[in-house]
Swiss-Prot record:
UniProt keyword Nucleotide-binding present: no
Molecular function as annotated in GO: ion channel inhibitor activity; toxin activity
Lineage: superkingdom: Eukaryota
Coiled-coil features, chain-numbered ranges: none
Signal peptide segment: 1-19
Protein name, UniProt field: Conotoxin Vc6.14
Presence of the UniProt keyword Signal in the record: yes
Disulfide pattern: 51-65, 58-69, 64-74
Length: 77
């Protein structure tokens, strides 16, 4: 029984090292992580202060929750 336990532990270590080498052992770039992560709705982004609601001042479309910057203010949608 002890030999079986040791054999299973050795197999687990070998498999984990093999997986590490096949994967390159590197962390994924942040771009890939952002792409694979859950995207927030416009309301969630606004609630957490990550974007501006309508009629707020903006300089570029990404400032607005609606991604619509008309003139100097965020448009509704």
């Amino acid at each position: 029984m002890e030999k079986l336990t040791i054999l299973l532990l050795v197999a687990a270590v070998l498999m984990s090292t093999q997986a590490m080498f096949q994967g390159g052992g590197e962390k994924r770039p942040k771009d890939k992580i952002k792409f694979l992560s859950k995207r927030k709705t416009n309301a969630e982004s606004w609630w957490e202060g990550e974007c501006l609601g309508w009629s707020n001042g903006c300089t570029q479309p990404s400032d607005c929750c609606s991604n619509n910057c008309k003139g100097r203010n965020c448009d509704i949608w």
